[in-house]
Amino acid sequence: MAANQRYRKPLPGTDLEYYDARAACEDIQAGSYDKLPYTSRILAENLVNRADKVDLPTLQSWLSQLIEGKQEIDFPWYPARVVCHDILGQTALVDLAGLRDAIAEKGGDPAKVNPVVQTQLIVDHSLAVECGGYDPDAFRKNREIEDRRNEDRFHFINWTKTAFENVDVIPAGNGIMHQINLEKMSPVVQVKNGVAFPDTCVGTDSHTPHVDALGVISVGVGGLEAETVMLGRASMMRLPDIVGVELTGKRQAGITATDIVLALTEFLRKERVVGAFVEFFGEGARSLSIGDRATISNMTPEFGATAAMFAIDAQTIDYLKLTGRDDAQVKLVETYAKTAGLWADDLTTAVYPRVLKFDLSSVTRNMAGPSNPHARFATVDLTAKGLAKPYEEPSDGLMPDGAVIIAAITSCTNTSNPRNVVAAALLARNANRFGLKRKPWVKTSFAPGSKVAEIYLKEAGLLSEMEKLGFGIVAFACTTCNGMSGALDPKIQQEIIDRDLYATAVLSGNRNFDGRIHPYAKQAFLASPPLVVAYAVAGSIRFDIENDVLGVSDDGKEIRLKDIWPTDEEIDAVVAEYVKPQQFRDVYVPMFDTGKAQKAPSPLYDWRPMSTYIRRPPYWEGALAGERSLTGMRPLAILPDNITTDHISPSNAILAASAAGEYLAKMGLPEEDFNSYATHRGDHLTAQRATFANPKLFNEMVKNEDGSVRQGSLARVEPEGETMRMWEAIETYMNRKQPLIIIAGADYGQGSSRDWAAKGVRLAGVEAIAAEGFERIHRTNLIGMGVLPLQFKPGTNRHTLQLDGTETYDVVGERKPRGDLTLVIHRKNGETVEVPVTCRLDTAEEVLVYEAGGVLQRFAQDFLEGNAA
């Protein structure tokens, strides 16, 4: 008998069964289940549920890791769903289409390559805000441009839903994946073959933890790891660090969920919760709506964690009802949660290895920036921080210093929270009543993550107020938050260039890394939706938003922020009256009623040879199919701390003078249709030219005459010592077949779950990366591409080793999970230094993937050997 059958029991009050993880844990140690944190209880159920092919001792060895809080052995995790946006989701499916070709060429059956786990792809990353919210026809124009630019991509995506099994596609113009996941796709409790079990999910975006707010373990992964899960493989893991965060107190009047999450992000970054599963509990957590919780969970990657969990409680049930879920499903969620010990009241006995406390009443009105989401500051401190200065608007009609050139209400972080959206709309209404206007140089936009926002704002009579101030709906997509802010007015852009202006962006997004939002917005600031509206009126980051005068009313009254900020009571009254279950049903029932798609005539995609968007991937051929020597490697770059995936493989608009822009011009694309780096990631010939193409990069191998590090997408080719553009350096090394290494500081690879940040360096010939530390998703992606992550021991770094880029490097030793290896450094003067480093292949499975050359090579081997899942 399978190890788990003894724990399969009837679910009370239903005709379903469930796996009793409590009983399985109690069989090992009495009273153990009550002490488990929420995360461990979900993981325990997943282990018991999927233990149909292992014996009881094996199952108990896995459960013992949870009970004893140990991190000694790997255990499998099988997520129930994979959610994708069109960039990484498309890239993953391009890989699977390429895998089909590779299998067919070796005599295998390509039709067997299919996702076996439910895979949901939402097209939300492709739309650029070319027309701002002051254009009444902006939505139509932006969608038409999106369709024209992305015809190749959308052709492929439409093919996938007919060619692959278990793939659902939500086409462009319908919303953001995380918000749709929250409002519709996640059932919280799944049912399969008569068994109820917790919904779990991985997504090809670092903000996938958005639905952790519902009590669903939902984590961001790279496209390569998503492919592993799609194909039914276990995601091998060790028990993560689990940190309890007790939320106390009650927020002050006028404080939004955005203010709370920016304060929490600063707090949790300082507390170093990197890679941890954070669990919120306490009276403060209970008081937060699901909208507020989702705003917090969404920014999980910004505070460095893997997940940000809230247990299921009455707020969860109320939200499921509000969003139009079926009554039977809502009842099942409550029944299952209370039976399985997942109801918040059952978590009072949970024991956390580490507990932090955060007082909600301490939160003031906040912003974050520039450059980092955890760089929080209170708006009352703008002057003290040196941002706000005595402000006088230029009388000559020119832009002021610190001009806000983009003000965007964007991102599922905030638009999935009706309270934040309504607050912005009410502030816009109040501003209109006093005759306030947006400044003419501010490109304003409103891009909700759900069509429901449009309905409740219309019914409340508030959408017209937003439109009057320039915040008409430009899209239901990610837009500015993922760098798709679109072109500026040419006159405004030229003025920025001619006057070398310090121009900025203010957005309600979740990231503000340098260069991400727009090439001409030197810095960006995160703020709540109502503050975004206020800054559109103010027009400059130098404006003291709390104290300076926004305008003068008809009767001569000076209008400040406090005069237009809506009360909590007014916000709550609008939400209570105008946000209704039927609105969600009206949006989502037709969206998901896709009918029966006709099956594609061939399992193989007919690649378009001139496409710059979709191209057969090269991962099973040429140099990538060969051995990695890990000897004689030269450094492509020596990099500082906090290198993000935006530095490694940017997402924003492709400029004509860039390597990718020059390539696209040669391929015959007009400059206005270059689109973004992100949209071209299905074509490796375009995408690899994005590698380290961020103009904000600091490669410490490239110096100015005064010895300071020179900024730009630059590299120094050795042994000649010649400085050139990064892409030319990569081409030079590729032609020489020169193996490469990257040396970096702490927190390498933070930010978006961007598999091209790993693919790009591997295609360049990088075989290893030695850093002081890695962000979780990027480290996994590197392994998935066959790049070896190495971590310096504490106290050792590029500075202590006095590295200058003239060295060559070898890696010596047997690769074992977190074992010691030796980085052998050969200096130019003939000296050799041996440096112990940690092999950051953290699990036995990761070692196997690396040795195979990466996950794609591993898949091909398994399918050809008949070991496919």
What are these regions (language model features)?
Residues 78, 97-152, 280-388, 546-606, ...:
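Terminal amphipathic helices with adjacent charged low-complexity linkers/tails
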Residues 87-96, 198-225, 289-312, 371-373, ...:
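Conserved phosphate/anionic-ligand binding catalytic regions in large, soluble enzymes, centered on
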Residues 553-570, 574, 778-849, 864:
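Acidic, glycine-rich flexible loop/linker segments
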